[in-house]
């Protein structure tokens, strides 16, 4: 293939990848964190290729063997093949085995955070030789990178379990390397190819021009990867085995939302209070109770004494008869535990968003190793800003409204029918 033909193909590929990356970013409600960064990296590659096309940059085959574009394509394809992608090109901080602060870029974070994917576009030959110490100075082998991923993942638990790591190879991986990764607990995706025994005449194994891939002569070694001998083709694991947390800690906002008349059909009103009218409109668009029920299903429910006490106090003041009845039923399903905030929760500095009650509730969930259900996203963000990340399930809030219905204006019947539950 001529250089100009290769250039044309690369430009087409870059344009297609930009469209796919933009579509990917739109595929999740609220977008995918890092989606804009991925698109901008692809656009930068396209811009560079177009400069070459316009004659502003001298055409070189090394430019066209763009490892950047190959890697970015691998990221897009990985994200397209996974469920619940929450971010791409996500940077995590961690402490290495020597106690030094490091950062790690995870190409795709999927399955709600439970899966970390490293997408690898380099060829199996190059990866294998780097692993054997035959790469260029400073090249880090895939196995060394895997150790970094494991170290970082242990420091970034999601719902109290470490993310599962997948290394996705888009230009194959040698069988010995794949075996080593599996032994380390890392899943491998891609073609696993054989490695031939020692060659008596390394010069027999010459690379075509299209296989140069920036590695140059480093591939002329005494062992070779046999790309044609594919031992296994491994797709992305359809189900990543994750120790799903079965404990749920209920915040006051969740207790209120769960029993609110608004969550049980009482959303067809215009209330005197603007915030209640807005919540009713949200409820007509998207019911919150089914989301709570689905998350709570088959899980053990907890609430700390402070949460239950304050919930009962709010009920006594604002709750209607139906809301109080539902509260009695709900409390019987819950194990009420003493307040026991975790040490890291107690280290939080008080602010407008971090008060002692929220600190106690979220901190008790942390001690229980439970996921805290809450509508208090402000506290979660404020704690995160102080470096404390709680395991949470965030939902929209619903206030106690049964006693307010008598003073509210019912919506016309045609509007009620259009948005009926």
Curated annotation (Swiss-Prot):
Pfam families xref list: DUF1308, DUF5614
Taxonomy, superkingdom: Eukaryota
Entries under InterPro entries matching the protein: DUF1308, DUF5614
Residues that span the membrane, as ranges: none
Family: Belongs to the UPF0415 family.
Protein name (record): UPF0415 protein C7orf25 homolog
Organism: Mus musculus (Mouse)
């Amino acid at each position: 293939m001529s250089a100009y033909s290769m250039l044309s193909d690369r430009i087409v590929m870059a344009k297609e990848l930009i469209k796919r990356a933009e579509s990917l970013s739109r595929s999740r409600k609220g977008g995918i964190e890092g989606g804009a960064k991925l698109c901008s990296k692809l656009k930068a590659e396209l811009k560079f290729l177009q400069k070459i096309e316009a004659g502003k940059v001298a055409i070189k085959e090394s430019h066209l063997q763009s490892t950047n574009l190959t890697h970015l394509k691998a990221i897009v394809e990985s994200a397209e093949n996974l469920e619940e992608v929450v971010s791409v090109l996500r940077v995590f901080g961690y402490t290495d085995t020597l106690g030094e602060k490091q950062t790690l870029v995870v190409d795709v974070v999927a399955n709600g955070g439970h899966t970390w994917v490293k997408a690898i576009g380099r060829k199996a030959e190059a990866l294998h030789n780097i692993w054997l110490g035959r790469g260029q100075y400073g090249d880090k082998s895939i196995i060394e990178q895997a150790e970094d991923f494991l170290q970082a993942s242990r420091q970034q638990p999601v719902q109290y379990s470490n993310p599962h790591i997948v290394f996705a190879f888009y230009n194959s991986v040698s069988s010995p390397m794949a075996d080593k990764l599996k032994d380390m607990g890392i899943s491998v995706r891609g073609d696993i190819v054989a490695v031939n025994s020692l060659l008596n005449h390394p010069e027999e194994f010459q690379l075509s021009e299209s296989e140069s891939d920036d590695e140059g002569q480093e591939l002329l070694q005494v062992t070779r990867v046999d790309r044609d001998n594919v031992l296994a083709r491994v797709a992305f694991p359809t189900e990543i085995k994750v120790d799903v947390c079965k404990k749920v800690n209920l915040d006051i906002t969740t207790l209120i939302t769960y029993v609110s008349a608004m969550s049980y059909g009482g959303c067809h009103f215009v209330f005197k209070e603007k915030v209640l009218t807005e919540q009713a409109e949200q409820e007509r668009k998207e019911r919150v109770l089914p989301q709570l029920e689905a998350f709570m299903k088959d899980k053990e429910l907890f609430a700390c004494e402070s949460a239950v006490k304050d919930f009962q106090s709010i009920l006594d003041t604002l709750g209607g008869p139906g809301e109080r009845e539902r509260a009695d039923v709900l409390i019987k399903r819950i194990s009420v535990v003493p307040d026991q905030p975790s040490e890291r929760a107690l280290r939080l500095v008080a602010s407008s968003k971090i008060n002692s009650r929220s600190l106690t509730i979220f901190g008790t969930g942390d001690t229980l190793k439970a996921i805290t259900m809450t509508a208090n996203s402000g506290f979660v963000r404020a704690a995160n800003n102080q470096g404390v990340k709680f395991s949470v399930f965030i939902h929209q809030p619903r206030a106690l409204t049964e006693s307010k219905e008598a003073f509210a204006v019912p919506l016309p019947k045609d509007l009620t029918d259009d948005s009926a539950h």
